[in-house]
Amino acid sequence: MKPSMRAKLDHLDTRLAELNSLLTSEEATKDMDAYRKLTREHSDIATVVEQFGLYKKAEADAQAAEEMRKDPEMKDFADEEQKQAQATMEELEGALQKLLLPKDVNDERNVFLEIRAGTGGDESALFAGDLLRMYTRFAERQGWKVEVVNAAESDLGGYKEVVLRLVGQSVYSRLKFESGGHRVQRVPQTETQGRIHTSACTVAVMPEADELEAVKINPAELRIDTFRASGAGGQHINKTDSAVRITHIPTGTVVECQDDRSQHRNREQAMKVLVSRIMDAREREKHQLEAQTRKSLIGSGDRSDRIRTYNFPQGRITDHRINLTLYKIDAMMDGDIDDLCNALASEHQAELLAALGDS
């Protein structure tokens, strides 16, 4: 084991003992916010320290076997004991490496998923509708709750823009690599000569802001407009100004919400999206600075990056970041994207392990 890794584990061992002492003290629950942070930290490192304890036991077994080898009558037995201990140490070291990988603090959060039609006009809007169905079906398979925050429909039944709120377990962890440009190649419904057209949509996956950590927004920097909500072609027209548009003047960020009949609930939901967008923009700026020093295949989240192509005539989906092509486009457009999500997560983990090895 590398000295740097050993030092990290020794530090965590000491820290767990400190946390045990803090959490059992009489003062522990006087500040509940601080208490929750301590219990979260305890939960994060307890498994690591437990595995490190098993590693140290195997290490002690290997040393005891080495001593035993000095006795000629015990040499064969000692060799076998040492071999087993070394194998256990190697297995535990691999597990500890993965446990020491930096945690994404947003992994367990709910998300706002935004799909915007880009180049390609009506065909792009129809593809946005296809992506909406893909992510909705995927969410249903995961047992997540799906809420439509805002939807701007196009004339042909697609979407110029749609924002979803996905609620459930590890939502951001599963979807965080979906941000970027999604390109589609197919014969549009409006094409009379059978020509293949290329169009695109952008997807943004933004973790829902934690109330304790959310950015503070000055109300004076907001412009709030209300208007009547309506569907495509003027359907479902509300007789009251229940729809809400909030503009954050310093950043120019605009959020609309008209899904609920209550103006109050629309305003509340729009504020949540606004805060998440501002926090997401700050995170992306931070990632771009990091990317200048370490090129990452995945996770830059740059909206201008084309990350994936959906080629319907060939029945394939290609993710350009990891050069993965899967020939099951119908199943994937119906929400079966587990293989893709798993491959992206594995590549990201491999990158983190490589970075840990360099440190």
Swiss-Prot record:
Signal peptide per UniProt: none
Main location: cytoplasm
Highest taxon, organism lineage: Bacteria
N5-methylglutamine: modified positions: Q235
Keyword Cell membrane: no
HAMAP family named among the record's database cross-references: Rel_fac_1
Entries under PANTHER family matching the protein: LD18447P
Name used for this protein in its record: Peptide chain release factor 1
Organism: Polynucleobacter asymbioticus (strain DSM 18221 / CIP 109841 / QLW-P1DMWA-1) (Polynucleobacter necessarius subsp. asymbioticus)
